[in-house]
């Protein structure tokens, strides 16, 4: 018997390309449903399952996303069986409430990550300059040692 479930995914799952990944996994497993960002910061999936093993594989595949993508952080997946069956078109489809608003949020998130990358690059630049200074000092000392050895020979 086909049952409709709601899966609620908590964590850093919005504006990081998560729903696209869900669509891909769902289609690969032959699951029908929808995925959308909820205003509380979660991602929600409404999907039909007629096989418990497929549902568990779907959830495990979702959880595994955070290992492949450092932007995604899944805290927990909550599962609710719905009392009503909802018929969905084949595959998992993404629902967007406002594509422009969504795009702006993703751009804002992207800017945060770019700033983080630049700040880390500055730190790495300082470290590399320190290493360079140390190497220059080491070369000077080695040259002095070389000169002393040449004088003794």
From Swiss-Prot:
Residues 4-102 form the Acylphosphatase-like domain. Transmembrane segments: none annotated. InterPro entries: Acylphosphatase (IPR020456), Acylphosphatase-like_dom (IPR001792), Acylphosphatase-like_dom_sf (IPR036046), Acylphosphatase_CS (IPR017968). GO terms for molecular function: acylphosphatase activity. This is Acylphosphatase-like protein MJ0553. It comes from Methanocaldococcus jannaschii (strain ATCC 43067 / DSM 2661 / JAL-1 / JCM 10045 / NBRC 100440) (Methanococcus jannaschii). The lineage of its organism: Archaea, Methanobacteriati, Methanobacteriota, Methanomada group, Methanococci.
